[in-house]
């Protein structure tokens, strides 16, 4: 036998008869205040205009309601939520790998790549990899990462200074706000 879940009244939007306050402040369709009325009086005004009485703020004293078309109001709220989600950007961590013996042109390519990532609002993890006995030259790798940090100064700031991680040395740069 299927179970029918009953929606709690709190989850439902407070419109028309669902507004349960002794007195409410009512705003007309054009934004002018009609004053403090009982929900029954306000509902009667809304029905005369063939519109709904929508609770905007129950935190105010007295609660604020507006006479409007609820379908239109709901659509606008959903549209605003969609726009907000669209504008949200999660900062990813993009990695730029190189060796400490990198040639000048290759280095410039990596800097341009990191610059593009920072402009897009992503963090950049600059990694210098070591092979075999190259790990003895960690000071050169640190100098390279510091040089990269100064080259990217206008676009980002060092979030984590150069440090060794196993056979790599890495540094984290976050975009400037």
From Swiss-Prot:
This is Translation initiation factor IF-3. It comes from the Bacteria. Its main location: cytoplasm. SUPFAM superfamilies: Translation initiation factor IF3, C-terminal domain, Translation initiation factor IF3, N-terminal domain. Monomer. GO terms for molecular function: ribosome binding; translation initiation factor activity. The keyword Endoplasmic reticulum does not apply. It is found in: Cytoplasm. GO terms for cellular component: cytosol; membrane. Belongs to the IF-3 family. IF-3 binds to the 30S ribosomal subunit and shifts the equilibrium between 70S ribosomes and their 50S and 30S subunits in favor of the free subunits, thus enhancing the availability of 30S subunits on which protein synthesis initiation begins. One of its GO terms (biological process) is ribosome disassembly. Keywords: Cytoplasm, Initiation factor, Protein biosynthesis. InterPro entries: T_IF-3_C_sf, T_IF-3_N_sf, Translation_initiation_fac3_CS, Translation_initiation_fac_3, Translation_initiation_fac_3_C, Translation_initiation_fac_3_N.
């Amino acid at each position: 036998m299927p179970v029918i879940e009953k929606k709690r009244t709190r989850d439902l939007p407070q419109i028309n008869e669902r507004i349960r306050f002794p007195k409410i402040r009512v705003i007309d369709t054009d934004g002018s205040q009609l004053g403090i009325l009982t929900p029954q009086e306000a509902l009667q005004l809304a029905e005369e205009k063939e519109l709904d009485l929508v609770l905007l703020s129950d935190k105010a004293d007295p609660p604020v309601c507006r006479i409007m078309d609820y379908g239109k109001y709901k659509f606008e709220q959903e549209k605003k939520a969609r726009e907000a989600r669209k504008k949200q950007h999660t900062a990813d961590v993009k990695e730029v790998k190189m060796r400490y013996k990198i040639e000048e042109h290759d280095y410039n390519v990596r800097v341009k790549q990191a610059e593009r990532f920072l402009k897009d609002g992503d963090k950049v993890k600059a990694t210098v990899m070591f092979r075999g006995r190259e790990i003895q030259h960690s000071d050169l790798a640190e100098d390279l990462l510091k040089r990269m940090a100064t080259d990217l100064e206008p676009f980002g700031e060092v979030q984590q200074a150069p440090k060794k991680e196993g056979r790599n040395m890495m540094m984290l740069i976050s975009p400037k706000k």
